[in-house]
């Protein structure tokens, strides 16, 4: 799964795609509503391709987590990120069996599931080839 150019921004909901960059700012487009705006250096943004989930062994890249969800859900939407905490934890255990429960919080699980569903809604989750 290619997450290149997809970011999340602290303080803003949803995911954004980088459209272009210059010296002073970055032009981004919301995956939710398609609105474009400028992102300046004061904003804290993270590339999804650089985010990982802690396991007891190492750190799994987000793309691997999304691939696991896509396999489980046949590339369809996953559970709602607003499900109960227990439902989210039970679901995530099926996706990443050995995730580090002391370092991965329920809020992290909610974000991962929300991001997966946003990517799926925007056609960025492809059917897995067998």
Question: PLM features: residue spans?
Answer:
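C-terminal charged interaction modules
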Residues: 87-130
